[in-house]
């Protein structure tokens, strides 16, 4: 390519370099690990769902790395997942949104030990604003290592129907409900777990309400205990991209007050 002809020559060289660069990026990106984050409020069944999901991915011949997270240490979730044979790293003492570097370090450690094809990360049940604090920086800073899946948020249907005003019953204080609703707001996929615990009519009512309140989001129903609906969920998060990189508005003072109302008990019982 001749560079003497001012603009056109330089443009041709730049185009060629860009093509070579894109070829290298495509080749490198083909080796990226899929990064799946599964959030949701306390008691929604995240760990059981993740265990089921990991088993199905493992059955596809994929290597799985799991990352657990909670406010305490020596997590029961970690012990349970390790007992099922999965390579599992633990981030105690704070949620992913405040421990981003620890999250990256955990993924690096799993990569060195077992070279996962897929990472599944489970944030603290009271955590929200994960798009701004985790998935966006992962994509922007470590996009050559990770292919980011849509953010799934798992919900308990009975609790969700009470909070959304579909059914009467006890629910959390307004400050805790604020966190719950923010989790739904930022989800790419809302996964109704424990579908076997409610009637088909109630399930359809809940799906309709979620579709109405959160248009554009994928709403799915599963039973982690019975194994129902997991294939559809897995296909979606394997093939789809996150809906948005836009951070939502969060009142962090209200968020902190809501978290302060929640408590954790870590104990080993013999």
Located regions from the model:
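G-domain G4 guanine-recognition motif of GTPases
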Residues: 123, 154-159, 187-202, 220-229, ...
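Low-complexity, intrinsically disordered Ser/Thr/Pro- and acidic-rich segments
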Residues: 1-8
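Canonical P-loop GTPase G-domain recognition
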Residues: 181, 196-253, 257
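Membrane-proximal helix-turn-helix segments that form the acceptor-binding/catalytic region
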Residues: 178-186
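Short, positively charged and aromatic/hydrophobic N-terminal segments
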Residues: 10, 16-21
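P-loop NTP-binding site
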Residues: 27-44, 48, 239-270
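Nucleotide-state-sensitive switch-loop elements of NTP-binding domains
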Residues: 29-39, 44, 48-178
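Short, structured coil segments at secondary-structure junctions
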Residues: 84, 186, 214-215
């Amino acid at each position: 390519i001749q560079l003497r002809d001012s603009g056109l020559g330089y443009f041709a060289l730049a185009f060629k370099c860009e093509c070579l660069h894109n070829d290298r990026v495509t080749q490198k990106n083909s080796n990226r690990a899929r990064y799946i984050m599964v959030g949701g409020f306390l008691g929604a069944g995240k760990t059981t769902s993740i265990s089921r999901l990991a088993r199905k991915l493992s059955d596809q011949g994929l290597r799985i790395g799991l990352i657990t997270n909670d406010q305490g240490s020596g997590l029961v979730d970690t012990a349970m997942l390790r007992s099922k044979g999965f390579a599992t790293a633990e981030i105690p003492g704070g949620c992913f949104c405040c421990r981003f570097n620890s999250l990256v370090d955990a993924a690096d450690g799993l990569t060195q030990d077992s070279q996962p094809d897929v990472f599944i990360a489970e944030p603290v049940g009271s955590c929200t604003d994960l798009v701004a604090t985790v998935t966006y920086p992962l994509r922007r800073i470590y996009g050559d290592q990770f292919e980011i899946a849509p953010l799934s948020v798992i919900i308990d249907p009975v609790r969700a129907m009470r909070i959304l005003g579909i059914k009467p019953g006890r629910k959390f204080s307004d400050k805790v409900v604020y966190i719950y609703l923010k989790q739904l707001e930022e989800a790419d996929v809302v996964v109704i777990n424990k579908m076997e615990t409610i009637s088909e009519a109630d399930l359809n009512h809940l799906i309709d309400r979620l579709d109405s309140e959160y248009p554009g989001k994928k709403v799915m129903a599963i039973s982690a205990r019975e194994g129902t609906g997991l294939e559809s969920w897995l296909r979606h998060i394997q093939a789809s991209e996150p809906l948005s990189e836009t951070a939502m508005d969060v009142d962090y003072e209200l968020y902190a007050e809501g978290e302060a109302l929640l408590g954790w008990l870590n104990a080993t019982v013999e």
